[in-house]
């Protein structure tokens, strides 16, 4: 079974995680305020740290507030990338293009994949995903899209 982690279980991230679990992927979640992730305990593993969530994951999705939050989760105080640098990192947050390019240069496998469709699209698993990155990584990620 493919293991995925999703970091950021707010309005968009929580239903995205639930849909990944429903699709049969072993899903681990983390949120900066852990109580926001607890409602997903019925279908996902909830962890207390981002590093714990990403350990052993084949793919890591980030869905957080902005470029600064993604930077902090991935490289800053939460150190998620260091815990699993070989995973396919898929950022679905809306971040600045220059930041996405910087992440792409720092991470072995990275897809910049902002989404459109709002909470309704996340709940119904109908989000439009606009992805930039290598063709190989995109092909690997299609199973989760």
Residue ranges of model-derived segments:
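NAD(P)+-binding Rossmann beta1-loop-alpha1 motif at the extreme N-terminus of oxidoreductases
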Residues: 1-63, 88, 92-93, 102, ...
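A short helix->loop->beta-strand "cap" motif at the edges of active sites that frequently abuts
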Residues: 84-87, 108
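Conserved short alpha-helix immediately C-terminal to the canonical SAM/SAH-binding motif I
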Residues: 36, 69, 99
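Short, conserved loop/helix-junction motifs that constitute active-site signature segments
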Residues: 77-85
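Glycine/threonine-rich flexible loop motifs
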Residues: 64-77
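Rossmann-fold dinucleotide-binding core
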Residues: 64, 94-145
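CheY-like receiver
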Residues: 52-56, 73, 144
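Alpha-helix C-terminal capping segments
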Residues: 37-42, 80, 103-107, 145
């Amino acid at each position: 079974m493919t293991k995925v982690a999703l970091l950021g279980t707010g309005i968009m991230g929580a239903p995205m995680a639930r849909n990944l679990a429903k699709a049969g992927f072993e899903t681990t979640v983390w949120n900066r305020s852990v109580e926001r992730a607890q409602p997903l305990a019925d279908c996902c593993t909830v962890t207390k740290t981002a590093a714990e969530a990403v350990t052993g994951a084949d793919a890591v999705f980030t869905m957080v507030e902005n470029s600064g939050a993604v930077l902090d989760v991935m490289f800053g105080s939460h150190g998620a990338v260091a815990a699993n640098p070989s995973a396919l990192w898929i950022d679905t947050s809306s971040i600045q293009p220059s930041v996405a390019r910087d992440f792409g240069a720092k991470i072995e496998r990275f897809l910049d994949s902002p989404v459109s469709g709002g909470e309704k699209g996340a709940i119904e698993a109908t989000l439009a995903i606009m992805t930039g990155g290598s063709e190989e990584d995109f092909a690997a990620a299609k199973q989760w899209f």
